[in-house]
Amino acid sequence: MSDANTPAPSSAAITSGVTSEQSLVDWLQTMPEVDPSSPSRLPGWSVGHVMTHIARNADGVLSMFSGLHQYPHGLDGRNADIEAGASRGWSELVDDVVSRSRAVAAAIAGRADWTGTVHMLPGERPTAQVPLLRQREVEVHRVDLGFGDEFADMPADYVRRDLRLMEMLWTSRKPMGMTTLPDAALALDPPTRLAWLMGRVEVPGLDPAGLF
């Protein structure tokens, strides 16, 4: 995918992503201990799975910034790393997420060159999209952990930016001429519309978005 039409992330977008990382760190460090084997909101994944994924995704961003593939050992290696880490104790999981979140926040905040592309698991993506995609991982998986956060609690500026990207993705997968979301989707408030596009909520009268 070319990055010709992907502008560099704004300073406000960078700050928003870094703030999401710090908010995640603060949230986890003040939370009472949780049983990592407890089910998350993601089918088949425990809290330990989601926590490990958040940390390994941060490692993936750092890997891409070094010119390597997001997950050098591919999908199977990514899944194996998540399985291997999911059974760790709560404090070890928190320490892992905290250290990786701080590292990726510093890397994003300190990066000056947003040109070119990176090697993500699905394929090439513009480097300039990485801050938003990482912020998505942080914000959406906070909800997936099942500790009480909802899409309505997400930063409004993040929701606005990711809605734009997700709506473009939805449109790109429809036949020519179907260029807008269904009226029932457009009637939803932005956080709920984003949750529907990401397959996190069912909406009466709407088929699943089918993007993930």
Question: What does each of the following model-derived ranges do?
Answer:
Residues 18, 22, 48, 55, ...:
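A structural signal for well-ordered alpha-helical segments within the folded catalytic domains
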Residues 47-76:
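Conserved alpha-helical segments that form or flank metal/cofactor-binding pockets of metalloenzymes
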Residues 1-42, 49-52:
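Basic, Lys/Arg-rich alpha-helical nucleic-acid-recognition elements, primarily the DNA-binding modules
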Residues 81-100:
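A short, structured beta-strand-centered segment in the mid-to-C-terminal lobe
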Residues 21-29, 58-62, 98-112, 139-142, ...:
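Structural signal for well-ordered, non-membrane alpha-helices
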Residues 2-4, 77-85:
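A short small-residue
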Residues 2-13, 63-70, 113-212:
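Structured surface interface patches that mediate subunit assembly and partner/cofactor docking
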Residues 25-46, 67-71, 110-123:
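Helix-loop segments that flank and shape redox-cofactor active sites
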